[in-house]
Amino acid sequence: MNIGFIAHNSKKILMENFCLAYKYILSKHNLYATGITGRRIEEVTNLHVYKFLPGSVGGDKQFMDMIERNCMDMVIFFYNPLITSPNTADIYAISRCCDQYNIPMATNIATA
């Protein structure tokens, strides 16, 4: 299974902790992430992560391309709903893309 990970800056530690807690399960799958999130997951878990560019410079577009080509089986996207930022549009774009291609997307620790 191909699992994609994205985390906004304020949620990167949460993503690290999540991946560390589920390291054994994640080790059986192909992991993909935007650049900085992927690097941090690798550092904490020692698992290999295929890394795209950072989201702010096109990594989110690379991520959506994988979804559109039906190469992503699920997405875990931790973002802070209390902060409006220039990256807010990527949340909606990736969410719409997942909905369009029937890819499950978790946006918090409980749904992940």
Feature map (PLM): residue ranges:
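Extreme N-terminal starter segment of soluble prokaryotic enzymes
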Residues: 1-3
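Short, glycine-rich nucleotide/cofactor-binding loops
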Residues: 5-12, 81
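Histidine-anchored nucleotide/phosphate-binding helix
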Residues: 14-24
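Short internal beta-strands
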Residues: 28-37
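Short hydrophobic/aromatic-enriched beta-strand-loop microsegments
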Residues: 30, 47-57
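Mid-chain, well-packed structural core segment of small domains
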Residues: 59-100
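Short, acidic/small-residue loops that bind anionic groups at enzyme active sites
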Residues: 95-112
